[in-house]
Regions:
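Membrane-interface extramembranous regions
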Residues: 2-150
């Protein structure tokens, strides 16, 4: 059992480091290639550039938090930071999905003129759901159903 726990810890730490690196990289892209992201911001939100920059800041911060979490998992016996980082990552993925949904429903092209096929959008949705699940796993999230009557 100790061997399996060690393997799970390594996978969780690696997942946090990879997820954090991805978020950090994409967050930086929000500043270096703003026009690529702007078309997928739903008009109802107002200034696309504002939301691209704000989401870039959020992705960089969540990325750093997940990288720290990965290091914490590898070098500490606690997952204190990971609980917060994992929940923040899951929440960010949920909050960013309206842009992906808008892109899918209205067949919006990205800043470089590329667009996803219907299969690509489904794959992206599944990746987003998987990312949320991995984020909650990193956070050691547990939801227990309780009977409120007794």
């Amino acid at each position: 059992m100790i061997f399996i726990d060690s393997i799970v810890k390594i996978i969780k730490g690696f997942s946090a480091l990879c997820g954090g690196s991805f978020f950090f990289y994409v967050g930086v892209l929000h500043f270096t290639d703003t026009s690529w992201f702007e078309p997928i911001v739903p008009p109802v939100f107002g200034s696309a550039r504002f939301w691209v920059l704000i989401s870039g800041v959020a992705e960089i911060l969540v990325g750093l938090a997940l990288i720290i979490t990965g290091l914490e998992i590898f070098f500490s016996s606690t997952n204190y930071f990971g609980r917060k980082a994992g929940l923040a990552s899951a929440l960010l993925l949920v909050m960013l999905y309206p842009a992906n949904l808008y892109m899918w429903i209205y067949d919006i092209e990205l800043g470089d003129g590329a667009s996803l096929s219907p299969t690509g959008h489904i794959f992206r949705l599944l990746l987003q759901i998987g990312g949320i699940m991995i984020s909650l796993w990193i956070a050691d999230f547990r939801y227990t159903f309780t009977d409120s009557n007794g």
